[in-house]
Regions:
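Paired acidic/hydrophobic, glycine-rich loop segments that form the ligand-binding mouth/hinge
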Residues: 191-192, 209
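Alpha/beta hydrolase fold serine-hydrolase catalytic domain that processes acyl esters and thioesters
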Residues: 179, 183, 192-194
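Active-site-proximal beta-strand elements of phosphoester/diester hydrolases
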Residues: 229-233
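N-terminal beta1-alpha1 cap of cysteine-dependent amidohydrolase-like domains
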Residues: 1-133, 141-149, 153-177, 196, ...
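The feature captures the ABC ATPase H-loop/switch
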Residues: 137
Length: 258
């Protein structure tokens, strides 16, 4: 790849909906110097043409993949700067505009699971940089033999809540020596949260790179030279935070360096 070539980054999502996440992720990749192409179960593309992969957020990973039966989950809220509110309002409006397509009639998406697990294995085998966002981080973990908590409400005791918000209302601690901490440049990070599940047992070769104070895993990475990162939050919805955009910059840089 020449210095002027823009690496091609595949971004996964559902067949119906997910347009706000796709547009924000594509924008982040473009700002980082790459090109983005959307991948779905109906349009899987050619993995060999990709220089890097983002496994996006969305519906829950089917617990069949880690040997469990489905449970049911719940939700909640939480508080924030003028810039945060402005960006959050714009992103929320985008998501609302596309929401009529985002209502999935099923809790799981087996065809998407199949495509994304194939792409994860391809990236790991081919040494391509891989970033998992929310569901994507969970699926990377499951693909490598890990498990999930289908509900994380028990982590939030009386007087606390699990704020589900595009705004950065959670604080996570970044593990010393982790790639994630180096990228974000601090010991802690403020992040958003749209998830009701989280990683439980780690998959092969993965380590925890971020946690909430209550122990909920918020970031994972694979040891070694290959870039394999997973974050439980949505950095694509935080374009106003430069440290969060470094995740996409590092992905594009690693794709270019292959």
């Amino acid at each position: 790849m020449t210095p002027d070539t823009k690496p091609l980054i595949g971004v996964t999502g559902p067949v119906n909906g997910g347009l706000a996440a796709w547009l924000m992720t594509a924008l982040a990749i473009r700002r980082a110097g790459g090109r983005a192409c959307r991948l779905t179960a109906e349009r899987p593309g050619d993995a060999d043409q990709l220089d890097g992969i983002v496994i996006g957020g969305g519906t829950d990973v089917d617990p069949f993949h880690y040997g469990e039966e489905p449970l049911q989950a719940d939700a909640d809220r939480g508080r924030t700067s003028i810039l945060d509110w402005t960006v959050g309002l714009l992103v929320s409006a985008m998501r609302a505009v596309f929401a009529r397509h985002d209502r999935e009639t099923q809790n799981f998406d087996p065809e998407r699971d199949k495509l994304e697990q194939t792409l994860i294995r391809h990236a790991l085998y081919a040494g391509k940089p891989l970033l998992g966002i929310c569901r994507g981080a969970q699926l990377i973990n499951v693909t490598l033999g890990g498990t999930l908590y289908q509900s994380i409400e028990h982590f939030y005791q009386e007087g606390t809540s699990n704020p589900r918000s595009i705004l950065p209302r959670k604080t996570v601690a970044l593990a010393p020596g982790s790639r994630l901490r180096t990228l974000l440049g601090s010991e802690h990070a403020r992040v958003n949260a749209l998830h009701e599940q989280s990683i439980r047992d780690l998959g092969d070769g993965l380590v925890v790179s971020a946690r909430e104070e209550n122990g909920v895993i918020q970031g994972i990475e694979r040891q070694g030279s290959q870039l394999v990162l997973g974050v439980q939050w949505h950095p694509e919805y935080l374009p106003q935070y430069r440290p969060q955009q470094r995740l996409f910059q590092q992905l594009v840089h690693a794709a270019k360096a292959r």
